[in-house]
Amino acid sequence: MILIAHRGCSYPGYNQNTLRSFEKVINEGVSAIEFDVQLDADGNLPIVHNLDLTMVSTGTGQVSSSSSDYLKSIHAGDPERGEDRIPFLEEVLELFASINEGKRPVLHMELKGNGTGVPSGKMVREYLDEGRLSTVDILVSSFNWDELKAIRTICPELDVALLDGAIRRGPLMARVPGGEVYFSELFAYGEEDYMLPRYPELSKNVTLLESLCPKGEVFDGLKEEIERCLSGGYYTQELLDEAEKMNAVSVNLWFQTVSEAFVEEAHKRGLKVLLYTINSKDELLAAAKMGVDGIFTDFYTESKEVLGLD
């Protein structure tokens, strides 16, 4: 099993998705680092998690409508944790390419924003063709599986992973018309295309829903979707079928909702299972006992010690 440094790290004094956070865990010997790729208004590829800048930078507005110059003028994360810039994909690829092959962590590139697949593929293609990076250095993941197909049109040899476990905004809006007015308060990342219940416990989510939405069809539809998500209802044979069809190497799933039985089924299909994002001792040990192949964590050194990894 491997640990993947989620957005670099969340150590005190470090901001996620920054070159400094990547360098920190690289120096600690991490074997893989995950980061998020978006597309800005100028067609460049900033490394930012949230679609809206407000919670993850000193800026405001959508990443997709922001210029590269604006993104370069603001700080990533909280300046009190360090005055970090928002990096761009080329800078990250340069950082990894500068590391000796034997010590180079695998880049887990999550294609976060719409339209990221082709431009990311073109940039990665240059590094592959120049021999500065190789296919074993890169794993591309996304909740938007069309972006995985898109990057494969440029780099067909890249390994891909299907992300799942989140509530998909578009399908939920279609199933529960009118429910979208509650998304921002009901879900984590409620303004985005892929959302998570606020709490791992169904009862807490139902209590929150009751405080927001009157009983009726909308209430029932939202409650049903939360129940489906938390019960692992998204982890189906169809998901594994799609992973096989796309020749994916893994499915990356929300640890709160995955079962040991599904992990075993994925393994029977020849697929690895990676879980996001685990930081507590008990949950790390439970995931390891389940037999998963990798865990995304915000605290690499602490998680490594808990699991007794070399």
Describe the function of each predicted region:
Residues 1-310:
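Phosphate-group recognition and catalysis centered on beta-loop-alpha active-site segments
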